[in-house]
Amino acid sequence: MEFPTQPKLVDGKSIIYPPGVKEITDKISNDEVVKRLKMVVKTYMDMDQDSEEEKQQYLPLALHLSSEFFLRNPNKDVRLLVACCLADIFRIYAPEAPYTSHDKLKEIFLFITRQLKGLEDTKSPQFNRYFYLLENLAWVKSYNICFELEDCNEIFIQLFKTLFSVINNSHNQKVQMHMLDLMSSITMEGDGVTQEQLDSILINLISAHKNLNKQAFDLAKVLLKRTAQTIEPCIANFFNQVLVLGKSSVSDLSEHVFDLIQELFAIDPHLLLSVMPQLEFKLKSNDGEERLAVVRLLAKLFGSKDSDLATQNRPLWQCFLGRFNDIHVPVRLESVKFASHCLMNHPDLAKDLTEFLKVRSHDPEEAIRHDVIVTIITAAKKDLFLVNDQLLGFVRERTLDKRWRVRKEAMMGLAQLYKKYCLHGEGGKDAAEKVSWIKDKLLHIYYQNSIDDKLLVEKIFAQQLVPHNLETEERMKCLYYLYASLDPNAVKALNEMWKCQNMLRSHVRELLDLHKQPTSEANTTAMFAKLMTVAKNLPDPGKAQDFVKKFNQVLGEDEKLRSQLEVLISPSCSCKQADVCVRDIARKVANPKQPTNPFLEMVKFLLERIAPVHIDSEAISALVKLMNKSIEGTADDEEEGVSPDSAIRAGLELLKVLSFTHPTSFHSDETYESLLQCLRMEDDKVAEAAIQIFRNTGHRIETDLPQIRSALIPILHQKAKRGTPHQAKQAVHCIHSIFSNKEVQLAQIFEPLSRSLNADVPEQLVTPLVSLGHISMLAPDQFASPMKSVVANFIVKDLLMNDRSNGDKNGKLWCPDEEVSPEVLAKGQAIKLLVRWLLGMKNNQSKSANSTLRLLSAMLVSEGDLTEQKRISKSDMSRLRLAAGAAIMKLAQEPCYHEIITPEQFQLCALVINDECYQVRQIFAQKLHKALVKLQLPLEYMAIFALCAKDPVKERRAHARQCLLKNISIRREYIKQNPVSNEKLLSLLPEYVVPYMIHLLAHDPDFTKPQDIDQLRDIKECLWFMLEVLMTKNENNSHAFMKKLCENIKQTRDAQAPDDPKANEKLFTVCDVALCVVYNKSAPCHSESSKDPVLPLTFFTQPDKDFSSKSYITDEARNLLLTGKPKPMTVLGMVNKPLNATGRRPYSRSTGSEISNNVSINSESDASVANRQSSEVPEIGVSENDENPVRLISVPPAKTETVKNKEVNLDQTAPSNTGTERGKKRSAASAGAENIRKESEEKKADNISATPTPKPRRGRPPKSESQGSAAKNDETSKPSGRGRKRAAANQESSGAQEAANAKVPKQDSTAKKTAQRQIDLHR
C-alpha cells in the first residue's frame, strides 16, 4: 500500500497541486516534469481573477514555480511551461503579484523574456504555446509590474531587444500587434524612456539593421508612431546631447544621428519638432564635414515626396538654401544634387531654388556647374514643366562654358530634351513650344572654334535633331521641317557643317588618290600635308596626328580597306551602304585584346564625319516629293508650325545647299521636273534657288536629259533679261556652267540687253546691268571689246555722270533697301559692272582700269555726289560711297589692278571705314574682313582696321578687333602649314602690316598738326588698336621685329611726297609714337631682331641710314601719351567746333545701348559676318545716321542720353568753305559740349575766332565749292593728292581710247609720282 507523499512547504504553507497532478520535484524525469506542468498550465489557464478560493489554494504552487529548479531548468519545454504558468499567475493575481521580492520579480521577468525567444521559429510544435505566452503578457500588461523595480530598465531593454530580434516575415499580424502592445504599454505608462531603451528601438532604423530584418524596422516604425507623444522628449534630449552638446558617448548610436533623423522624419515629423532647430544650428557649424552631413540629411528631408518641411519650417529652409553658397565645395555640390529631387517632388519650391542655381551655374568649380546642368535636365526629362524657362536658360548659358565636360553635358542634355518633347511629341504642343529654341542654340555652337564642340554638334544633329536611323521618308520630313523652322544663324551653321564634312570628304578622297600614285618624295610630302589637314578636323589634333599617320599606314597595307573607304566617300554612296562601310572599317581597325582603343575612337570620329548618313539620291527624291506636296497644298506644313510658302522656300534653300555637297544625288528626271516647276513660280527666292541648283548639279543635263535642257534654256534666258538681279546673275552662271554652246547662249542675251539700255527708265536697268556685268566677267574674250563701248557711252557718260531725279531731302544717312531710288540702284550696279568687266579682262592694256579707279576716287571725293548738283539724297550718297569703296577693294584683289592703285586711292578707300554713316562703316568692314580672311587682299588692307579705333560705336570697334584677331591667326597658321618664300612672306606675315599702318595714319586727314597732343592721342589709339593684337604673344621675337620696322622707316622718306618736309615730319612723328607704344607694351628684351625688315617701296623710299635720327615727339608728349588722362572728347570729333555740312549730326563715342534700336550694332560671328550682304542692313529710324538728332553728354562722361527731338541748325555758323578742307570731313564728338570742355578752353576758343574753323568729317575729302574760299585756306591743311577739284575735270581729254573716262577727274598733274613698285605684296 502506497502512502501519498508529504506535501512540501513553501513559506510555511503546503503546496497543493491541481487534481491529478503529482508533486513536481527534481527527482523525476524531464518528461514527467513536462507532463505534470502541462496539467498545471491547464489549471492556471482556466482560472480567472474572481476565483479567490483557488487563488489562495494555489498560491504556494505559484511561489514554488518561481524556484531555482524551474527558472534555471535546462529543459526548454519545462521553461516554456513554467513561463506560461507564471504569465497566468500574473494575470490571476493582478494587479498585485504574489511575489514580493524585487529580486525575485526581476529574475522572473528576465526568465519570461528569455522564453519569448522561442517566438522566432513559427514552425516549432511549441509555437502556439509561445504565442499564448506573448498574448497573455501583452493583454495583462504584466511587465508594468516592473515599474516598481529600481532596475526595471534592464528588463525592458532585454524585452525590447528580444522582441525586435525574433520578429520575422513568417509572423502574422497578431504576433506583431501583441509585441507592439507589450512594448507600447511599457513606453507610454512608464515614467520615461531611458537612453538604452531608446537605443534598443532606434537601432532597428539604421540601414545595416534594416537590411537584415525589415520586420524589426517596421515594428519599430509603428511603435514610434504609436508612442510619438511620449517618446518625443526622449528623442529630443538624445539629439540635443549629441548635436548641441557634442556628447557622443551618451549612446552607441551617436554616429548615426543623421540617418536616424531621416528615418524618424519619414516615420513621423512630429518626433523631431524639437530637433529641427538644432539642425539649423548645425548648418552654421565651422566644421565643413559636419555641415556636409547636415546638408545631406536635410536634402533628403526637404526633397522627400510627401515632405512639407519647407513650408512648415521656413527658417530652416532659408538656412538650408544658404548652403548653396557654402565656402566648402562638397557642401555646394550636395546642395545642387538635392535640387533635382526637390524640383521633381516639390515644383512649388522651384522659385526659391532658381536664384541659388543661377549663382551655382557660374560656380568656379567645374563639378558644381556640371551638376547644376544634370539637376535641371533630370527634372526636365521627368516633366518639362517642372523647370521654368529661367532654369533652362542656365543650361543654355553653360553650352558656352570654358570646360568641355560642362559644355558637353549641357549640349547633350538639351538635345535629349529636344528629341523627347519636339521629335517624339511627348508633352504635347506646349512642351514642344517651350523647347523649340534648343535646335537653334545647339547649331549656333558650331560657330565655336573648338573642334570638340563642332564634332558634338554633328553627333547631336545625326542622333537627336535628325536621327539617321529613321526611314528615309521620315528622316527627310524631319530635316525638311527642321530646316524651315531654324533661325538664319542656325541655318548658316548647318550649311557650314555640311560644307566642313564635304571638305573633309574631299581631303580623304585626295589622300586615297595619293595612295594610287607611285611613291616619291613629292608624294610623301603631299601625303603628310594632307594627313595634317585631316588631323586638324579631329579631336585633340596633337594626338590625332599620330593616329592619322597610323591609319594611313593601315590604308597603305590593306587594299580592301582602301576600297571600302573609297565606297564610303564616293558621291554615289547610299546611306545604307555608308552604315555597312563604317561598321566594316571599324571592325578591321578594332583590336579585341584592347577594350579601350583610342585609335579606334579616332577612326570612328573620322568615319562619322565623312559618312553620308543623311543624304543620298533616295533622300533627295524624298525631299523633292515633300516640296511638291507643299506646292500642291497637301503637306502637313501647318501641323508642323510652318506656312506652305516658308516650307517651299526653305525646302529650295535646303536643296540648294545640298546641291553643293551632294550634286550627284540630284541627277534624275523627277527632281529636275520639280525644279522646273519651281522656276515658274512667282516667288523670286524660290526661282533663284532653283536656278542655283541647276547651276550646281546640271553638268550632265545636256547629254543625258535633252527634254529638261529644252525646257530650261528659255526660262534661263527670260530670267537673265527680266528676272530679279539675283536670278539674272544665277541664270548667266547657270548657262555658262552647264551648256557647251554657252557663247551662243550668252550672245543671245548680251546683244538685246546692250542695245536696249535706257538711262531714262532706271527701274528696268538693274537686271540688264547685272547680266551684262556677269557675262563680260565670265566670257571676257568674247564680250570685253563690245562692253567697252557700252561702258564709255552709256555707263559713264549717260548713267553715272547724270542725275535725272531729285533725292529725298529727309536728311537721313541711310534708308532701307526698298526705299532706295531706282536710279541709285542702277548706278550701284553700274559700278559693279565696271568691276566685273575689269575682273574678266585681268589686264590693263587699254588703261581702262586707271580710268575706272579715277572715277571711283572722284565718287569718294565728292561724297557720292559725282555730278555735284546736290540733287541726290544723303542716303543715296552713302550707298554710292559704299559702292565705290567696295569696288576699289574688289579690284585690289586682282594683282594686275592692285599694282596700279595709287597710295592716294588706297587712302581714300581706307577712309570709308570711318564714314559718317554707320551702315557704310559696318558693311565695308565686313567686306574687308571677308576678303582678307580668304587671303585675297594684299596685307596693306589689313592696316585699314587701325582706323576703327576712331569708330564711335563700341560694338564696331569690338567687331574690328575680332576681325584682326581672326586675320592674324589665319595668316600665322598659313605660314606654319605652308613654307613660303621671303617675297611671299612680305604679303603674309602679320607684323608687316605695321609700315602700311604708319603710312596710312601719317596721311590721315585729321592728322594736321604733328605736335598737337590731342591728335597724337588719336594716332596712338589707332596704333595701339592694331599693335595690341599683334603683340599679344612675342612669337619669334616679333616685338623686336616691329621695333626694327619702325626704326627702319625713320631711315626713309615718304614715297608719296619725298620732298615735302611736312609729310615726312608727320610720317616720322607717327613712327615715333609707334616706337613709344612698342617700347612701353613689349616685354623687356635685349635681343635684336635677326631679320632685317624690307619696306614697301610704294610707300617708302630706299633707306638712308643717316637720314633721320632725331625724336619727333617731346618727352612731355611721350609721358602724356603713355600715362596721361583720357581725352575729354570722343575720338571721332572735336567738341565745340561746328560742322561744315548743314545740319550734320555730330558723333559721340557711345555704348551699344545708347544707339537707337534701329541700328544693328551687335558684333557677329565670323560666319555671319562673311555672309552678310548690303541688302541685309536693317532699317533705321532716328539713329546715328540722322542729321538732326543730337547726342548730349552729361557730366559723368560714361553715361549719355539720346535727345530725339532737338535739332541743330548750322546754316548760320558754318561758312560755305567746305571745298577748302582737303581730306575727309570729321564729325564733332558731341553737342552739349559745355559738359565736357573746360570753361577756360571755351573762352579761349571764343577769343581766337568768332566763327571757328569747321573740322573735316571722317569719311571722304569734301568737294570744293568755290575757288575763292580755297585760296583762303592754310596750305598746310591740305593733304596732297586727294583728287582734283571739279573745276579741273573739264580739262580732261576724251579720246576714243579713254572714252570710259570722259568726265572722270584725274590726279593733280603737280602731284609727285610714286616710285616703281618693287615688292609684290599679293602674289
Swiss-Prot record:
Bias (Basic and acidic residues): 1235-1246
GO biological process: cell division; DNA repair; mitotic sister chromatid cohesion; negative regulation of DNA replication
Region annotation Disordered: where it falls in the sequence: 1139-1323
HEAT repeat residues: 385-421
Keywords from the UniProt entry: Cell cycle, Cell division, Mitosis, Nucleus, Repeat
InterPro entries xrefs: ARM-like (IPR011989), ARM-type_fold (IPR016024), Pds5 (IPR039776)
Keyword rRNA-binding tagged: no
Family matches, as CDD domains: PDS5
Pfam families attached to this UniProt entry: PDS5 (PF20168)
Subcellular location(s) of the protein: Nucleus
Ranges of biased composition (kind: Low complexity): 1153-1165
Biased composition regions of type Polar residues, renumbered to the chain: 1166-1176, 1210-1220
PANTHER family: ANDROGEN INDUCED INHIBITOR OF PROLIFERATION AS3 / PDS5-RELATED, SISTER CHROMATID COHESION PROTEIN PDS5 HOMOLOG A
Assembly with partners or alone: Interacts with the cohesin complex. Binds chromatin in a cohesin-dependent manner.
Additional information: Chromosomes assembled in the absence of pds5a and aprin/pds5b proteins have a mild defect in centromere cohesion in vitro.
Protein name: Sister chromatid cohesion protein PDS5 homolog A-A
Natural source organism: Xenopus laevis (African clawed frog)
